[in-house]
């Protein structure tokens, strides 16, 4: 319990945000069900004609879903979980501020729910317009409680926004410029700026409403020289950016999902970034399009009509960039991809109807009609991020897969700093592909470390662990459960453990050039346990496997390794083939002979496909899909199996 109350770990706090959002979603859904039951048939149904109660339920539903479900989930939950991982930061810039920004939300939700039970409840709608929210219409304490709830929620969001902005600007990995940030990080960054600029205006508006109700001021009371339209201007100066606060994190999520399941980088990265910034800036300049029906003068309506239509330009850039990302890609129609495609379709419809409503004269005619509600609902992004996880493996399978990945493309390093102290690193380098980046981010979120993209040497993504606590907590226990099976990694691990437990610099310089000297004497390491070897082999193929469609029409799979004859022999036996090639070539760096298993028969390659499809998690999976699609015989043989998956 103490861990969760006092935690300053970004992932713990992200988990708390997500749990809180699910709890709030259940409350909000319960209110929604009551509304739908009442509207299910003409006339009075369940609320006995109590219109105030109906308005209270509407208000509570809106506040709960906006301030306690969508914002905590998308910004607090996914933001805390993914932003530090994506920029290579160990945590957020202000961990304790992160903690308090979450723990302000439960009392805020309690205050909001309490407002529904004080006297007749707050039946003002989520806009809380005066004079309906004034003393004459709501004389009890319900609206005051709702205002205090919004204050707490707003403070929470502003603290979180400051934290995100500082983290993104100051805690990126060396070499990660702003133009290399993942799009989801940009989305959270833009959202944080919008929160920081818009929430103080809302706070001022509802504070003036509070003083009108309790301290005899008349900011919004015409009898004292006030104007209720002032409240509408202040509220919608917050309210329209709030729409983008809800949708922009969804933009970032959809960009990653579309990229990952298309097997391509996002089309027009810079255009996507500047489109998000443009949407954020323009969002502050169009607030009065929510107020066409209150009697604005014609010049004001003309300006807001033009400004609102301009927002369609950056929005269109984003939609066409998503479509261009899909075009020509190797599409995998998974659950998150279906959500993303549904979002693009609905968002396009919502955006087009929004352009029509931007026209002030049409908006007045269509005001309070279902057309307007449909516009907003169609712009809502869906729950694809909840379903998007590159790995469908159990933790036991993932452990073996990660060790296989390290055996293939990883290295355990012991280095010195200025001949004084020893440094310890785990490094895994893969090709610079979006799905490899996503896969390594997920692995890093479980086992620790940082992931970053490097542009030199043709580009690659790299997962590094260099923190002794992380080694002690996750990496070394992983190797004790799942032994590496290549002689290279076996000797690296032995060398690593000698100095990890006793960092003797003099002994290090004495032994560092001889750690591979006994490689010939290493006994066969492959694990005979079929389940472990099968899962380990998935990670090893992700690193070292090769799928080739030959110009003659045939298809083959091959995997090679320096020195480890017995390991390659075990792979050959696992796939039930008899052919093992001993190449005359020697490894460029190691100088050891190269052993290779090559499988070209239809039955053998089909066996490999059946084994690899559930296990591969990165770019090799895309290669395998293309490999199958280019071969008619493989496509025919594996069709039923792939459909089942």
UniProtKB/Swiss-Prot annotation:
SUPFAM superfamilies: Cytochrome c oxidase subunit I-like, Homing endonucleases
Protein's UniProt keywords contain Magnesium: no
Keywords on record: Endonuclease, Hydrolase, Intron homing, Membrane, Mitochondrion, Nuclease, Transmembrane, Transmembrane helix
Subcellular location: Mitochondrion; Membrane
GO cellular component, one term: respiratory chain complex IV
GO BP annotations, alphabetical order: aerobic respiration; intron homing; respiratory electron transport chain
Record-annotated membrane-spanning stretches: 15-35, 56-76, 99-119, 145-165, 183-203, 234-254, 266-286, 304-324, 337-357
Region (COX1 exons 1 to 8 encoded): 1-368
Single GO term (MF): cytochrome-c oxidase activity
CDD domains listed in its UniProt record: Cyt_c_Oxidase_I
Modification(s) after translation: The mature protein may arise from proteolytic cleavage of an in-frame translation of COX1 exons 1 to 8 plus intron 8, containing the aI8 open reading frame.
Region feature (COX1 intron 8 encoded): 369-645
Function: Mitochondrial DNA endonuclease involved in intron homing.
UniProt similarity note: In the C-terminal section; belongs to the LAGLIDADG endonuclease family. In the N-terminal section; belongs to the heme-copper respiratory oxidase family.
Protein name: Probable intron-encoded endonuclease aI8
Lineage, highest ranks first: Eukaryota, Fungi, Dikarya, Basidiomycota, Ustilaginomycotina
């Amino acid at each position: 319990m103490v861990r969760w109350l006092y935690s300053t770990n970004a992932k713990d706090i992200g988990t708390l945000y997500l749990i809180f959002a699910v709890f709030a979603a259940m409350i909000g859904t319960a209110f929604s069900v009551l509304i739908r039951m009442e509207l299910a048939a003409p006339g009075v149904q369940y609320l006995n004609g109590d219109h105030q109660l109906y308005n209270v339920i509407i208000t509570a539903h809106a506040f709960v879903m906006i301030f306690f479900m969508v914002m905590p989930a998308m910004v607090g939950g996914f933001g805390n979980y993914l932003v530090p991982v994506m920029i290579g930061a160990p945590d957020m810039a202000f961990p304790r501020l992160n903690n308090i920004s979450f723990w302000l939300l439960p009392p805020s939700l309690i205050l909001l729910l309490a407002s529904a039970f004080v006297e007749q409840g707050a039946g003002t709608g989520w806009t809380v317009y005066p004079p309906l929210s004034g003393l004459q219409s709501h004389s009890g304490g319900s609206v005051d409680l709702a205002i205090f709830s919004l204050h707490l929620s707003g403070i929470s969001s502003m603290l979180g926004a400051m934290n995100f902005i500082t983290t993104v600007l100051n805690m990126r990995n060396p070499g990660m410029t702003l133009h290399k940030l993942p799009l989801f990080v940009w989305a959270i960054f833009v959202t944080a700026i919008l929160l920081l600029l818009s929430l103080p205006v809302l706070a001022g508006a509802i504070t003036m409403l509070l003083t009108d109700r309790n301290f005899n001021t008349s900011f919004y009371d015409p009898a004292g020289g006030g104007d209720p339209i002032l409240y509408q201007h202040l509220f919608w100066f917050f309210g329209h950016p709030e729409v983008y606060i809800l949708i922009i994190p969804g933009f970032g999520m959809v960009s990653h999902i579309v990229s990952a399941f298309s097997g391509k980088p996002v089309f027009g990265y810079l255009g996507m970034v500047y489109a998000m910034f443009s949407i954020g800036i323009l969002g502050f300049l169009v607030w009065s399009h929510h107020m066409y029906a209150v009697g604005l003068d014609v010049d004001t309506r003309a300006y807001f009509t033009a400004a609102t239509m301009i927002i369609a330009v950056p929005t269109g850039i984003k939609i066409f960039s998503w479509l261009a990302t899909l075009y020509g890609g190797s599409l995998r129609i998974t659950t998150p991809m279906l959500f993303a495609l549904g979002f693009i379709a609905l968002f396009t419809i919502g955006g087009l109807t929004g352009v029509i409503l931007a026209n002030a004269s049409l908006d007045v005619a269509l005001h309070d009609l279902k057309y307007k509600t449909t516009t907003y609902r169609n712009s809502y992004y869906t729950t694809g991020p909840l379903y998007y996880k590159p790995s469908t493996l159990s933790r036991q399978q993932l452990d073996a897969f990660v060790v296989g990945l390290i055996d293939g493309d990883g290295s355990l390093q012991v280095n010195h700093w200025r001949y004084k102290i020893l440094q310890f690193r785990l490094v895994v380098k893969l090709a610079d592909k979006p799905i490899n980046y996503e896969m390594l981010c997920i692995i890093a979120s479980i086992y620790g470390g940082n992931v970053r993209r490097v542009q030199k040497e043709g580009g690659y993504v790299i997962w590094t662990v260099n923190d002794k606590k992380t080694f002690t907590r996750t990496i070394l226990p992983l190797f004790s459960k799942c032994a590496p099976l290549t002689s290279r990694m076996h000797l690296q691990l032995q060398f690593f453990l000698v100095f990890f437990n006793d960092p003797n610099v003099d002994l290090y310089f004495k032994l560092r050039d001889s750690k591979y000297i006994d490689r010939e004497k290493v006994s066969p390491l492959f694990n005979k346990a079929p389940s472990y070897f099968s899962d380990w082999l998935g990670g090893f193929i992700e690193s070292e496997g090769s799928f080739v469609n030959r110009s003659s029409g045939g298809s083959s799979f091959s995997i090679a390794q320096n020195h480890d004859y017995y390991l390659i022999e075990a792979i050959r036996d696992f796939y039930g083939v008899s052919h093992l090639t001993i190449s005359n070539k020697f490894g460029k760096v190691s100088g050891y002979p190269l052993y290779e298993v090559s499988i070209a028969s239809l039955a053998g390659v089909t066996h490999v496909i059946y084994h690899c499809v559930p296990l591969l998690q990165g770019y090799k999976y895309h290669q395998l899909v293309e490999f199958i699609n280019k071969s008619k015989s493989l496509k025919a043989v594996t069709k039923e199996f792939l459909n089942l998956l």
